[in-house]
């Protein structure tokens, strides 16, 4: 694992088929959602996921899903990203490389011995015993400790060793949604303050990952402030930030006060519906290119006063100054987006419920999206010149998230406002037959492969 040692660096972008090297491009902290992605942070779920699926609602999930299949889907997604020349930094790989002292400190913070039912127990003796165990732990067991967050509830007994225990775990089953624990603005990385207490420890792991990569975060949201990465979208010379179920005004205020957005215009998109299925901005709005975006139909067609009707507040400052001032308030979000020159592709309800809107843009008019969407949506995307790589994520999406939620983009190509997407549009105007086909493990299928294939967004069986 190589550290990203400079804020701005260059890397050699490799074509999807690996056949031709393209020209060296400047990579920076993301300025625009549609710029070519270079580095992404991800976490393939493992044992920590199981506790979440045995009571999905309590785990912040939508339905039960198979842990092993979910992990295989995730590995397939990573393979598809890497096939596009993107460097994927994996949380587990980083934890296997960080300094042992840092890892042990993180484990020390989460391993608990509960002696509340033993009032006569010597607390100092218990703590010394806990430290002794931690000091003996192997690296892999320290990682297990960090991911499973165990508590040992002790009680006395006259049998055997004199102790017995209940073992309680609070595993980080949502860690694979690496979009949420932080956001990456043109200024750098901000560590979030999660809306859910059970997700709060995830931020410490992500913070450690950044430091190991040489990307020390510039700030952390604290106190009553709430901020989650799914609510943030960089859009060229503006920042879009959702305010609703998971992000609040105080979190946004802290960012503006710290000059953490890196843009002179901040658009606060207000969610009045507060619905779990649309918990973040990226679940009902997303950007494909500088003049093309998507929005779920219920938001796009909503009338003023309806819960689905999004409004936005626009904060601005004079370039070169720090203080933002409220410029416009309660503006219709759809009108604002169209006024900035965006064509909006509608996402109908059936596709929305299959997480069609939660795609990842990896280059102008080139997205990674959940397979199995309607032919109508696929046609709309083709007509707009969008190159879609359809990903099999049938299990993982039952965690209330998809391709965008599972990625934290660390670096993208530098944004150049003068680039016209017309050439990109003509290159990507693909027919249904020319869309790529993939095996279930995410590798590209060839004409000789048989069995279940993901082709044009749908599962087909080749005999």
Q: Can you annotate each of these PLM segments?
A:
Residues 22-418:
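The feature marks the mature, well-folded catalytic cores of soluble enzymes
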Residues 239-240, 445, 460-461:
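Short, isolated positions in well-ordered beta-strands
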Residues 403, 432-433, 449:
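First exposed extracellular module after export/assembly in secreted or surface-exposed proteins
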Residues 444-451:
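Conserved beta-loop-beta connector loops within the AMP-binding
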């Amino acid at each position: 694992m190589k550290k990203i040692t400079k804020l701005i660096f260059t890397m050699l972008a490799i074509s999807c088929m690996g056949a031709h090297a393209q020209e060296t491009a400047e990579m920076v902290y993301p300025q625009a959602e549609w710029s070519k992605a270079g580095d992404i942070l991800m976490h393939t779920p493992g044992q920590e996921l199981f506790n979440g699926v045995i009571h999905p609602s309590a785990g912040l999930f939508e339905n039960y899903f198979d842990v092993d299949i979910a992990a295989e889907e995730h590995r397939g997604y990573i393979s598809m990203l890497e096939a596009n020349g993107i460097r994927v930094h994996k949380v587990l790989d980083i934890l296997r490389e960080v300094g042992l002292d840092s890892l042990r400190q993180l484990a020390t913070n989460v391993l608990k011995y509960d002696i509340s039912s033993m009032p006569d127990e010597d607390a100092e003796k218990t703590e010394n015993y806990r430290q002794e165990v931690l000091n003996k732990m192997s690296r892999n067991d320290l990682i297990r400790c960090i991911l499973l967050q165990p508590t040992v509830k002790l009680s006395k007994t006259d049998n055997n060793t004199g102790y017995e225990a209940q073992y309680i775990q609070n595993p980080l089953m949502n860690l694979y949604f690496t979009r949420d624990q932080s956001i990456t603005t043109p200024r750098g990385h901000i560590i979030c303050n999660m809306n859910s207490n059970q997700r709060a420890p995830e931020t410490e792991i992500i913070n450690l990952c950044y430091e190991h990569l040489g990307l020390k975060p510039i700030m952390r949201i604290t106190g009553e402030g709430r901020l989650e990465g799914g609510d943030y979208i960089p859009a060229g010379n503006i920042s879009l930030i959702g305010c609703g179920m998971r992000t609040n005004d105080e979190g946004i205020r802290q960012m503006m006060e710290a000059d953490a957005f890196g843009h002179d215009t901040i658009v606060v998109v207000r969610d009045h519906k507060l619905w779990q299925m649309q918990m973040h901005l990226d679940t009902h709005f997303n950007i494909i290119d500088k003049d093309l975006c998507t929005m779920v139909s219920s938001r796009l067609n909503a009338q003023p006063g309806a819960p689905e009707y999004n409004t936005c507040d626009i904060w601005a400052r004079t370039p070169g100054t720090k203080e933002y001032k409220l410029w416009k308030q309660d503006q219709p979000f759809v009108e604002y987006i169209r006024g900035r020159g965006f064509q909006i592709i509608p996402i109908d309800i059936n596709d929305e419920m299959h997480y069609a809107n939660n795609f990842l843009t990896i280059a102008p008019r080139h997205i990674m999206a959940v397979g199995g969407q309607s032919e109508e949506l696929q046609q709309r995307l083709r007509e707009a010149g969008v190159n879609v790589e359809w990903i099999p994520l049938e299990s993982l999406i039952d965690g209330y998230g998809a391709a965008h939620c599972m990625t934290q983009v660390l670096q993208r190509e530098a944004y150049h406002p003068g680039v016209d997407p017309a050439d990109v549009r003509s290159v990507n105007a693909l027919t249904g037959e020319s869309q790529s086909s993939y095996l279930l493990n995410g590798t590209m299928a060839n004409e000789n492969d048989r069995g279940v294939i993901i082709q044009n967004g749908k599962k087909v069986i080749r005999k």
